């Protein structure tokens, strides 16, 4: 019987940190208002030209390295995100192409917190 497992974990976050105080310049809000309602103090923003697929590909490569596996042993790619680079193709297809494993299944799950 085949069993699924998570052999490695990877993540990728943008370098740019945007604090609540920076948002005060663009909208009628305050650090206190945001923190009291969401608990959020800062967030990461990508630079122009960087897409969800760039972060997903970087995270995938880190997970593959951690797992110490050949990407060709992967059977399925699932990407969970509410943001995509394009309406079509999905981010999973871009990850699949970047990893060079085009003969397997890949799909996106639209999800947010």
Please describe what each predicted stretch is.
Residues 1-75, 97-101:
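Conserved "HGTGT" condensation-loop signature of ketosynthase/thiolase-family condensing enzymes
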Residues 7-10, 80, 110:
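Short beta-strand segments
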Residues 48, 106-113:
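Active-site nucleophile and cofactor-binding loops and adjacent substrate-binding regions
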Residues 52, 56, 88-91, 112:
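Conserved donor sugar-nucleotide recognition element shared by glycan-biosynthetic enzymes
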Residues 72, 86-89, 103-106:
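Short, flexible active-site-proximal loops enriched in glycine and acidic residues
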Residues 83, 87-97:
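Short Gly/Thr/Asp-enriched flexible loops that form oxyanion-binding sites at enzyme active sites
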